[in-house]
């Protein structure tokens, strides 16, 4: 009976974590480049336990046009690299801008990293006359002068590296492996790959799982209490 309570409690924990992930996915439905997270329960029949593991859906989100020359979308594999106070982070969010001192930065002001380090375009800019072009391979040119190359990196372990809206940091640029199977599209952004209908369906199913597990815990706890009462007679 104690074992049954323990297993049901684990199911409650799994349902809670599932609901947290579903809520996060729905909250980021309109977040550029967001990759949905999910939890699945693998039933270990031999041990009679439920193991909860996290997963990241790295599938391509829909691409939409913005006509902003500083918006970039990656089709295929790979992530942009940005330099934060925590080190290098990787992201599919390509809504960039140019800072007052000429750096290409993300929406939080973090410098975008190229193959030669942080990308600074100051010396190539000529006010409103600056014609910024980015090739499919991430080569940045301004007024036909080559200025920098975006560092598009490869990440194999999405689950381990997931950290908030980006993927986790590393302090050493040499840890980064360059991706080759990608294409950069200028003037486009990638939508979140969250499907709201799927998430709502998951929410209903998880709610049912939680209710079932809660009823089982309540039943077993009541049965245990009755057994203890009989033992006192």
What does each model-identified segment do?
Residues 1-233:
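Amphipathic alpha-helical polymerization modules
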């Amino acid at each position: 009976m104690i074992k049954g309570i323990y297993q049901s409690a684990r199911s409650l924990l799994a349902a809670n974590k599932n609901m947290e992930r579903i809520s996060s996915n729905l909250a980021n439905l309109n977040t550029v480049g967001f990759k949905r997270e999910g939890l699945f329960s693998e039933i270990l029949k031999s041990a009679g336990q439920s193991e909860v593991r996290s997963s990241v859906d790295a599938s391509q989100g829909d691409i939409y046009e913005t006509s902003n020359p500083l918006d970039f979308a990656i089709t295929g594999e790979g992530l942009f690299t940005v330099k934060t106070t925590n080190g290098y982070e990787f992201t599919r969010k390509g809504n960039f801008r140019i800072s007052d001192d000429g750096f290409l930065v993300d929406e939080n002001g973090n410098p975008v990293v190229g193959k030669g380090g942080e990308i600074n375009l100051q010396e190539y800019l000529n006010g409103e006359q600056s014609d910024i072009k980015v090739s499919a391979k991430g080569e940045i040119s301004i007024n036909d002068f080559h200025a920098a190359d975006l560092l598009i990196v490869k990440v194999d372990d999405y689950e381990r590296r997931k950290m908030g809206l980006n993927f986790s940091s590393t302090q050493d640029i040499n840890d980064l492996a360059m991706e080759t199977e990608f294409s950069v599209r200028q003037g486009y952004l990638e939508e979140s790959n969250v499907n709201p209908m799927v998430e709502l369906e998951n929410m209903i199913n998880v709610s049912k799982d939680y209710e079932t597990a809660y009823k089982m815990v309540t039943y077993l706890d009541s049965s245990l209490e009755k057994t203890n009462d009989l033992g006192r007679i």
